[in-house]
Amino acid sequence: MNKKADIWISAVIYVALGVVILAVVLAATTPAINKMRDRNTYLQTKEVMHKIDSTIRDVLREGPGAQRTASIEIQRGEFSITTGADNPPTIAPKKITWTGPSKYIASQEGSTITEGNIKISTIKQGSQYQITLTLDYTNALAGLNTDLKTLSGKYNLLIRNEDAGKISIKGI
């Protein structure tokens, strides 16, 4: 009878030891996994921004009436389009911006770097960083019109050259 109890006690100790080891491994790897996930989100969003920029510049180069579609997916963060319509008719900002929290550091904290036409900035906020990717068309476009202000999830965009450097972006 005593031998049977010893076997059960040993089994419980081995299971408890296994659970403790599993918990330690998970606690050690979770921050690294989260940082890699944030890095992948940043890289995918940067690729989306390059795609949108390339499409806008192609449509602009082709002249009035030219249009293209772009499929995008915004997984995390806030993707917004500023048309400058709320500002006086001086030089109003025309920007496409993505901002999101991250454990990944995309650029030196507090400075802005340029990669192609994308401006990348990183600001420390508590234990995380706030990454901002910006496409600034203020000096490149006469107008930027859209029915979309903030995007999240999957979208098909129609980017069209309306006339004389005016671009419209619509969800389809």
Placement of each model-derived feature along the sequence:
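Short, glycine/small-hydrophobic-rich surface segments
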Residues: 59-81
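N-terminal single-pass transmembrane signal-anchor helix
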Residues: 2-29, 37, 41
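General N-terminal targeting signals
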Residues: 24-26, 50, 73, 113-115
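A generic structural micro-environment signature
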Residues: 13-15, 39-42, 66, 78-80, ...
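Solvent-exposed, charged interface segments at domain starts and junctions
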Residues: 4-12, 70, 86-90, 103-105
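Intrinsically disordered, low-complexity regions enriched in Pro/Ser/Thr/Gly and acidic residues
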Residues: 82-172
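Membrane-proximal N-terminal amphipathic helix
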Residues: 34-66
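Short amphipathic alpha-helical surface micro-motifs
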Residues: 51-54, 73, 149-152
